[in-house]
């Protein structure tokens, strides 16, 4: 397993349309292992293969990226002090994913992206989706998804079409986000 470099805007590869996976082999398994390691290291909750420079229709998602062996996390807010139990990892792999049935009802989540670091914006997407995908063995799965999982899968699937979350923003908001990113890079 290896941590791969995450490509960032304005890298033109991020605008590339990814191609379907046809070979479910050891090379694919290695890619997926590397993607999880890269995503956890970043840290993030989702990663598309194109974000590590591989134009294949492969996504990894884990909405529970915390280390299960970690000590409870101390938290202070609203004058209260308490501890959170760390959550367990739930790694999921989506190969050649498709959205079959997006709802007409929409929800808004604040999104960020490992390829657009330090930038966050509210994006509106279908609240529920029916998704179909293949696993590492090529077996087909189908599932109804909602909430953060539906949003995250749609965000990652956008990468497969060369679309970034900032592309869903108005031109003004997108330009402001890109200027902010440029400033952050100059300051670093």
From Swiss-Prot:
Its cofactor is Fe(2+). GO terms for biological process: co-translational protein modification; translation. Its EC number is 3.5.1.88. InterPro entries: Peptide_deformylase, Peptide_deformylase_sf. It comes from the Bacteria. One of its GO terms (molecular function) is metal ion binding. It holds the Pfam family Pep_deformylase. CDD domains: Pep_deformylase. Keywords: Hydrolase, Iron, Metal-binding, Protein biosynthesis. Binds 1 Fe(2+) ion. Residues 70-90 are annotated as: Disordered. Fe cation binds at residues 113, 155, 159. It catalyses: N-terminal N-formyl-L-methionyl-[peptide] + H2O = N-terminal L-methionyl-[peptide] + formate. The active site is at 156. It is an enzyme of class 3 (hydrolase). SUPFAM superfamilies: Peptide deformylase (SSF56420). NCBIfam families: pept_deformyl (TIGR00079), PRK00150.1-3 (NF001159). Belongs to the polypeptide deformylase family. Removes the formyl group from the N-terminal Met of newly synthesized proteins. Requires at least a dipeptide for an efficient rate of reaction. N-terminal L-methionine is a prerequisite for activity but the enzyme has broad specificity at other positions. This is Peptide deformylase. It comes from Novosphingobium aromaticivorans (strain ATCC 700278 / DSM 12444 / CCUG 56034 / CIP 105152 / NBRC 16084 / F199). The lineage of its organism: Bacteria, Pseudomonadati, Pseudomonadota, Alphaproteobacteria, Sphingomonadales.
């Amino acid at each position: 397993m290896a941590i791969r470099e995450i490509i960032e805007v304005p890298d033109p590869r991020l605008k590339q349309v990814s191609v379907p996976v046809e070979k479910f082999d050891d090379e694919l398994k290695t890619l997926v292992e590397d993607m999880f390691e890269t995503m956890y290291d970043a840290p993030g909750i989702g990663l598309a293969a194109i974000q590590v420079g591989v134009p294949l229709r492969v996504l990894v998602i884990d909405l529970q990226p915390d280390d299960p062996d970690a000590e409870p996390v101390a938290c202070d807010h609203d004058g209260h002090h308490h501890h959170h139990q760390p959550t367990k990892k739930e790694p999921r792999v989506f190969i050649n994913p498709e959205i079959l049935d997006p709802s007409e009802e929409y929800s808004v989540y604040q999104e960020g992206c490992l390829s657009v670091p330090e930038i966050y914006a509210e994006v509106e997407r279908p609240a529920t989706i029916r998704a179909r995908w293949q696993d590492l063995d090529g077996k087909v799965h189908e599932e109804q998804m909602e909430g953060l999982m539906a949003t995250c899968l749609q965000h990652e699937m956008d990468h497969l079409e060369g679309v970034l979350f900032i592309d869903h923003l108005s031109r003004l908001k997108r330009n402001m986000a890109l200027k902010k990113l440029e400033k952050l890079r100059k300051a670093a």
